[in-house]
């Protein structure tokens, strides 16, 4: 009984800790991130065409905020709004920058997540970003790198990301994310405004971030199941013939009634204990009490109780309920009648409501 109660309490506490690790629904969060960006698809070809070197990697950073729409059964759904400096690519000639392409803008995306371990989510994001691309051209012959021209263009680009996020505390989470931005910018030379260069790179970046979740508070505590314990006592003279272990026909109605109550208990563990009176040898009484306990247990198994959820033990003449009441009684028939309360089968049922 005590072990069962302790186990249920521990299970309840474990469930509560899991709930505290996950973000709560209908709450907001905000964070910052930083990492490295890399330009791909078109940069190398453009550099070869104009016979310049290039730097594709740069520092990237951003801020983001989100609203947790759903978090149930390890599945989460949020909407995120952010602003990123997506990074920059540079064209280089003779050790000097001759062209620079920078990108920044806002983005909106849906974030779906799945909790793989307690407090650890993997996630994916898909959305759209409104990106402003700035192109700056420099005079490579000037030691001060005087700008010859500057041009910019805003364009919508697809944004996708995958990552992992860990809740250090219910209010604080860290994430590692790979993000890619598709077809960024569309440069048109100032002397040819109707002509666009075949240069629309996509930008991949790996970022580390940290976020604060608002309104988490104490997570809802999952209540431990209510412990249920029931005990039934059967008079052996009603259930069995004297000195026998076979169930009487009239015992069926009593056992069926007990089974009906037993079936209302969840995760039930059943212990059947058989007892005899003090008449006869110890060996005979232990054997008889065990057989009677087995008969009752087998009846319940036949009704549907799992065999591994029920036990049967015979205790012989142990634990008499008559005490010293029959010590002065004389005669076998009188003793048999007096000892009747000792001849019993007790059924203990423990589980949850």
Curated annotation (Swiss-Prot):
Membrane topology annotation: Multi-pass membrane protein
Cysteine pairs bridged by disulfides in the record: 326-338
Protein's cellular compartments: Cell outer membrane
Transmembrane segments: 27-37, 58-69, 77-85, 104-115, 120-128, 158-167, 172-179, 205-213
Keywords, in A-Z order: Cell outer membrane, Disulfide bond, Ion transport, Membrane, Porin, Signal, Transmembrane, Transmembrane beta strand, Transport
Residues in the signal sequence: 1-21
Domain OmpA-like: 227-353
Keyword Disulfide bond: yes
An annotated GO cellular component: cell outer membrane
Marked site: Part of salt bridge gating mechanism: 80, 175
Keyword rRNA-binding on entry: no
A GO biological process held by the record: monoatomic ion transmembrane transport
GO molecular function, one term: porin activity
HAMAP family listed in its UniProt record: OmpA (MF_00842)
Record family assignment: Belongs to the outer membrane OOP (TC 1.B.6) superfamily. OmpA family.
Subunit structure comment from the entry: Monomer and homodimer.
Record remark: domains: The extracellular loops are most variable in sequence, and in some bacteria confer sensitivity to phage and/or colicins.
Entry function: With TolR probably plays a role in maintaining the position of the peptidoglycan cell wall in the periplasm. Acts as a porin with low permeability that allows slow penetration of small solutes; an internal gate slows down solute passage. Reconstitution in planar bilayers with lithium dodecyl sulfate-solublized P5 yields narrow pores (58 pS conductance) with a low probability of opening, whereas n-octyl-bD-glucopyranoside-solubilized P5 forms large pores (1.1 nS conductance) with high open probability. The large pore easily converts to the smaller pore at room temperature; at 42 degrees Celsius the smaller pore converts to the larger one.
NCBIfam families per UniProt: PRK10808.1 (NF008071)
Leftover remarks: Cross reacts with antisera againt E.coli OmpA.
Protein name: Outer membrane protein P5
Phylogenetic classification of the source organism: Bacteria, Pseudomonadati, Pseudomonadota, Gammaproteobacteria, Pasteurellales
């Amino acid at each position: 009984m005590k072990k069962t109660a302790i186990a249920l309490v521990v299970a309840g506490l474990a469930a509560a800790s899991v709930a505290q690790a996950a973000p709560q629904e209908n709450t907001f969060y905000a964070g910052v991130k930083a990492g490295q960006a890399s330009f791909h698809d078109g940069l190398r070809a453009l550099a070869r065409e104009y016979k310049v070197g290039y730097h594709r990697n740069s520092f990237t950073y951003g801020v983001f905020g989100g609203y947790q729409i759903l978090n149930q059964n390890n599945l989460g759904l949020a909407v995120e709004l952010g602003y990123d400096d997506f990074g920059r690519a540079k064209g280089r000639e003779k050790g000097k920058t001759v062209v620079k392409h920078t990108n920044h803008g806002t983005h909106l995306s849906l974030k779906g997540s799945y909790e793989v371990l307690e407090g650890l989510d993997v996630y994916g994001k898909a959305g759209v970003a409104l990106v402003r691309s700035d192109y700056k051209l420099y005079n490579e012959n000037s030691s001060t790198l005087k700008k010859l021209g500057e041009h910019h263009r805003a364009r919508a680009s697809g944004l996708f990301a995958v990552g992992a996020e860990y809740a250090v505390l219910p209010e604080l989470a860290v994430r590692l994310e790979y993000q890619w931005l598709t077809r960024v910018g569309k440069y048109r030379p100032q002397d040819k405004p109707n002509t666009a260069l075949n240069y629309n790179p996509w930008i991949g970046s790996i970022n580390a971030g940290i976020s604060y979740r608002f309104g988490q508070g104490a997570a809802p505590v999952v209540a431990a199941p209510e412990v249920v314990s029931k005990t039934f006592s059967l008079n052996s003279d009603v259930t069995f013939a004297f000195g026998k272990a076979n169930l009487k026909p009239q015992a069926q109605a009593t056992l069926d009634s007990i089974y009906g109550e037993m079936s209302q208990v969840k995760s039930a563990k059943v212990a059947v204990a058989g007892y005899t009176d003090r008449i006869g040898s110890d060996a005979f009484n232990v054997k008889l009490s065990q057989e009677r306990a087995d008969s009752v247990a087998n009846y319940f198994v036949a009704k549907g109780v799992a065999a591994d959820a029920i036990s049967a033990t015979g205790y012989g003449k142990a634990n008499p309920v008559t005490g010293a009441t029959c010590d002065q009684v004389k005669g076998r028939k009188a003793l048999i009648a007096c000892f009747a309360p000792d001849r019993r089968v007790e059924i203990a049922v423990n589980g949850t409501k």
